[in-house]
């Protein structure tokens, strides 16, 4: 990795085929993840004296879709403040004007690993239950503001070695409006809910299906519904859970209904058969958590008909989860989204670019005026946020998360990993 000087405020790092032009306060950059939305580096923030993750968005103004996702992610990250949502620490661009603006950097908390790695561990009921509880708290916080994540998957959920969990990546998150008809290609295939696969309208509990898939993966150690395309994905679901009833079929669009009704009929399997006791850890003595409770929760999450699927609120009160219940976490005040038309907006690339640039300048102005607490004044076009600089342990400490080099690399996440085991719950 080579390093050269650009100007008095910024340093340049060559990271693979990409160039990171970052504030001098960010040192020792090291690539830790890459994906369609960007490249992520771990770095040390000399001002905050902590390790952070810096995400450079890949060609944010390549087209309208990329630009809209970049705007959505930035706006939502600026608004959300919850212990189970990844914290935004800084936003900056090295360019000095709208005309020059082309690179966007987002600085986040650095975590130790994602659930792809955690799933490979031998988790006891306490850890499994506590991780689920935190997922649900984060999701409820988003839903309280009408935000549907839509892309929940193991690589978008990160953890610290002390079992603290955070949800990240808001590039596909959507504010819930009056219409819920959306493309079926918004969620990584394996975790797509039936209503998404079948092009139906959907609401907040689309995220609950994804959580159920993740829980099932924790138990089995492998993907539940590994479809090769969206048709095969549907087949994988009904082969295990059974063909839905006529009542559900009536909700489908005529062409989709014809296809679904012409598929072979499957009786499905009971959850006792799909998830036998042998797959679970030993029953917990401390919190009285049992395989039967986890299986019951799973059976309420993995319900094909969304109208009969468990809600986030009810899931938080389920016996397998409510041992951790804390109103400060589960009932945190909803984030205030200033842009009520966040998803209805349609703009040209240049208009999106201007909107994003204004968000960066707004952040800078808030930092200057002390609205964003605990941070020094920004340099150049850089802006800094300390309001969410949580007191989580530095990633420079010896981490106890285990990793498997054969696992797929995380996509666009803020994590760093090292070998070991997952720490205790609170």
Curated annotation (Swiss-Prot):
Its cofactor is Mg(2+). It is found in: Cytoplasm; Nucleus; Synapse. InterPro entries: Kinase-like_dom_sf, MAP_kinase, MAP_kinase_CS, MAPK_JNK, Prot_kinase_dom, Ser/Thr_kinase_AS. CDD domains: STKc_JNK (cd07850). The active site is at 151 (proton acceptor). The TXY motif contains the threonine and tyrosine residues whose phosphorylation activates the MAP kinases. This is Mitogen-activated protein kinase 8.
């Amino acid at each position: 990795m080579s390093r050269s000087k650009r100007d008095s405020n910024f340093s340049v790092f060559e990271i693979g085929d990409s160039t990171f032009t970052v504030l001098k306060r960010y040192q020792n950059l090291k690539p830790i993840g890459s994906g369609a939305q960007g490249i992520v580096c771990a770095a040390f923030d000399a001002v905050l004296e902590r390790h952070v993750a810096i995400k450079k968005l890949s060609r944010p103004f390549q087209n309208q879709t990329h630009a809209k996702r970049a705007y959505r992610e930035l706006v939502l990250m600026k608004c959300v403040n919850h212990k189970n949502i990844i914290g935004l620490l800084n936003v900056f661009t090295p360019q000095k004007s709208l005309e020059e603006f082309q690179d966007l950097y987002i600085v986040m908390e650095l975590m130790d690993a994602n659930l792809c790695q955690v799933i490979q561990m031998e988790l006891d009921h306490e850890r499994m239950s506590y991780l689920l509880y935190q997922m649900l708290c984060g999701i409820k916080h988003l839903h309280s503001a009408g935000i549907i994540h839509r892309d929940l998957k193991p690589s978008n959920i990160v953890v610290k070695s002390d079992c603290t969990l955070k949800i990240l990546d808001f590039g596909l998150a959507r504010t819930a409006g009056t219409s819920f008809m959306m493309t079926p290609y918004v969620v990584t295939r394996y975790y797509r809910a039936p209503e998404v696969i079948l092009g139906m309208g959907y609401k907040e509990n689309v995220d609950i299906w994804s959580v159920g898939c993740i829980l099932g993966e924790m138990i089995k150690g492998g993907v539940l519904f590994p479809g090769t395309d969206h048709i095969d994905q549907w087949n994988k679901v009904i082969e295990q859970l059974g063909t839905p009833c006529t009542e559900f079929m009536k909700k489908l669009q005529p062409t989709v209904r014809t296809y679904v009704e012409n598929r072979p009929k499957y009786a499905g399997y009971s959850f006792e058969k799909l998830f036998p006791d042998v797959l679970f850890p030993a029953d917990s003595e401390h919190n009285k958590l049992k395989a039967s409770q986890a299986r019951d929760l799973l059976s309420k999450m993995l319900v094909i008909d969304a109208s009969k699927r468990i809600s986030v609120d009810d899931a938080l009160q389920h016996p397998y989860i409510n041992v951790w219940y804390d109103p400060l976490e589960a009932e945190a005040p909803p984030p205030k989204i200033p842009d009520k038309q966040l998803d209805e907006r349609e703009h040209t690339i240049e208009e999106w670019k201007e909107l994003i640039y204004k968000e960066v300048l707004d952040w800078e102005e808030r930092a200057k005026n002390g609205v964003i607490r605990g941070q020094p004044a920004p340099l150049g076009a850089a802006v800094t946020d300390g309001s969410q600089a949580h007191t989580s342990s530095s990633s420079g400490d010896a981490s106890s998360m285990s990793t498997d080099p054969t696992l797929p690399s995380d996509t666009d996440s803020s994590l760093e990993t090292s070998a070991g085991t997952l720490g205790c719950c609170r």
